[in-house]
Amino acid sequence: MSGIEWIVEAQGCAAESLCDPATLGRLFKQIIDDLQLRPVGETQWHQFPKTGGITGLCLLAESHLACHTFPEFGSLCLNLFCCVPRSGWDFDTGLKKIFAAQSVAVRTLVRQYVQDSEIPGIEAPGLEDLSAASYKG
């Protein structure tokens, strides 16, 4: 059995969008809606007074969605973890559209909970099928 995690870095983002909780809220809503994820409670946000950067966390029935923004560097870091394999979200297109990101890097990790052979009758993608990958979109 395995889950999948996306670690995303967007660079060259518009600083003002990285300081806007409403913009980040729309991003979270879009990802959650598109992937049919199930939030558990309200997303929590913290804005840092000195830089305006924001940290956000949404607890999901499937695991979590988190972000950290660094407007002083024009960067946004996202982490989405789902405890079962699923299709990903188009982070490259979405982050370029919403935050005017100049570049987006996505690392996809398979989080292997147990060896597939330990669960009779269950076939889950192994590391050879969904190997950790990095790409720039």
Where are these regions (language model features)?
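Polybasic/polar functional segments that serve as interface/processing modules
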Residues: 1-137
